[in-house]
């Protein structure tokens, strides 16, 4: 199946690397015009030059409401009315309840959670007349906290709650806007690689249906396929839903 997003306009935050990069490429391949934003301007500009005229890059601090306003205006001025928003940008910082630093916790909330709040607000404002899909990147840790990443877990739990609140609000207001979240266990991105303990190899953590069924990490393109599903009309009956890409971890309580 191709061209599932023909005629659609999408914005992907954190789109210059990792999952965001794979999402940008996949949505373009399915016919959408795709804007992507990132704090890394050099990487973003280089990628935009490679992707062609149906894409555009905007430097974006997702924790800044002023930046959001500028980005939304620039995207719609050049590409047209927004149909799909992927709130993907985020950070991962360690810290348990005894040793975690308040400044790290505040930064996690600002980038992982406040950005989604602002994005949903501005996404709804842009789509309420025409409809669309908002997709928030959460984590399995929103339901199964990681003790060494207490602040990160809390920031993603808030994303889960914000998603449901936004979906309910859109329904009650009569907006044809769907709001859903994706909850991966692990994604093998540069950010994850940097956090792995010494001696832990890609093969040890990566899920493989034949070689490592217990693996808890997935390649970014697998998660991008879930984003495509939620962005397309194939998921038209879904709003306020959570897609768990966790290989049954929640059911096992691990």
Swiss-Prot record:
Signal peptide: none annotated. The keyword Ion transport does not apply. PROSITE patterns: ADH_SHORT. It catalyses: testosterone + NAD(+) = androst-4-ene-3,17-dione + NADH + H(+); testosterone + NADP(+) = androst-4-ene-3,17-dione + NADPH + H(+). Its EC number is 1.1.1.51. NAD(+) binds at residues 12-40, 61, 156. This is 3-beta-hydroxysteroid dehydrogenase. It comes from Comamonas testosteroni (Pseudomonas testosteroni).
């Amino acid at each position: 199946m191709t061209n599932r997003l023909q005629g659609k306009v999408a914005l992907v935050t954190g789109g210059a690397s990792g999952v965001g990069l794979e999402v940008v490429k996949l949505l373009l391949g399915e016919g959408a015009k795709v804007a992507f934003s990132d704090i890394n301007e050099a990487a973003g500009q280089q990628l935009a030059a490679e992707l062609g005229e149906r894409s555009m890059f905007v430097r974006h601090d997702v924790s800044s409401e002023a930046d959001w306003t500028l980005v939304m205006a620039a995207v719609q001025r050049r590409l047209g009315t927004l149909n799909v928003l992927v709130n993907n940008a985020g950070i991962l910082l360690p810290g348990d309840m005894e040793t975690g630093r308040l400044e790290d916790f505040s930064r996690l909330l600002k980038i992982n959670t406040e950005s989604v709040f602002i994005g949903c607000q501005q996404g709804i404002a842009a789509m309420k007349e025409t409809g669309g899909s908002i997709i928030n990147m959460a984590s399995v840790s929103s339901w199964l906290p990681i003790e060494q990443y207490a602040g990160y877990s809390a920031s993603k739990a808030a994303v889960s709650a914000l998603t449901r609140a936004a979906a309910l609000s859109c329904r009650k207001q009569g907006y044809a806007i769907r709001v859903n979240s994706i909850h991966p266990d692990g994604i093998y991105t540069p950010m994850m690689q940097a956090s792995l303990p010494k001696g832990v190899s890609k093969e040890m953590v990566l899920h493989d249906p034949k070689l490592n069924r217990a693996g808890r990490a997935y390649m970014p393109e697998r998660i991008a396929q879930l984003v495509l599903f939620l962005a397309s009309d194939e998921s038209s009956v879904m709003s306020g839903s959570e897609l768990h890409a966790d290989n049954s971890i929640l059911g096992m309580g691990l």
